[in-house]
Amino acid sequence: MLYDTAQDALRLVVLDPARMTFTSCGETTEAPSFLTVDEGITGAYWGELAGQPMPEDMAALRAYADRLEAKYDVDILLSDQCAGPCAASWEDITTTDQAGLEDEVAAIYPALEALDRTLALYPDGFFTQFRNARGEGGVQFLPVSEFHMSFEVIGMSFENGDWHCIAYQVSNERLETLLCHEIWHATEDKLISENWNAIDSWTWSACNPRGFDYYYDYDDAMNEAGGSWLYFGAAEDVYFVDAYSTMNPREDRARIMEYIMGAEDEADALAQHPVIRRKLEIMAAAVRAGFDTAGWGITRWEQPLTVQDRAA
């Protein structure tokens, strides 16, 4: 096999040494090796978190997902791979291969870019700690087309054996905040599975208005929650991010983490409200108690707690 530099091609040549003549050559010109590694390829793989060329097909998209898996120690399923875990959720979820999308790769790719940007917000080794003692399971992401439920859903977190599954709608415009919301649900599930009282219910309830009880119903929460307690309701005394936060304690906490982690323009302002700040402190302490945090430093969700109260 010879490399023809003039034609930039490989040629298969059969030689009979008995019919060849040999002469010595004093000077030679070094030909570029066809085995030379193009280091620009690694830049395309490991460069910016967004803005890389669109994968040409599902195989290239799978390769991108594989790189994210290795980078963050998570599991990512695509297209029809999501069907099994989605069935385990006992909810009606349409996977992207069943959605009749004009270009399935183009629909999923931005959702993987958003996932890359989101996972980069968490400390190194964070997601590894979701695995069991044998190193099995962990966090599994399922980019899907849509959910068919009794109320509007754009993402959900559920457990499937040793997996903390996070299904999320690829067409949503606020994927980073959505993912931060669902990652908190998975985090809370991990904490409570190891310590049922990881977040003390009495301590949490003490943060809320006197006599308040969560609605535990989507329609009631969205229709009846008073704006006088809501951050997105022009309240003076803020207890909750928005009406959805009043549905139950889990959604209250996930909504806080959604905006603290995924909405940088709101995080500091939200954490300046004493009750929200106290709730965030409770959540941060639970994570510190339930994870090996050696080498973490100040996490993104703890950063707003370091900002001095501007009202002081």
Predicted regions and their residues:
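Auxiliary, metal-adjacent structural segments of Zn-dependent hydrolase domains
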Residues: L12-V14, M20-T23, L78, C86, ...
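Hydrophobic, Leu/Ile/Phe/Ala-enriched alpha-helical segments that form helix-helix packing faces
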Residues: L68, L115-F130, I183, T187, ...
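Non-catalytic architectural context of zinc metalloproteases
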Residues: Y3-P110, D219-G233, R250
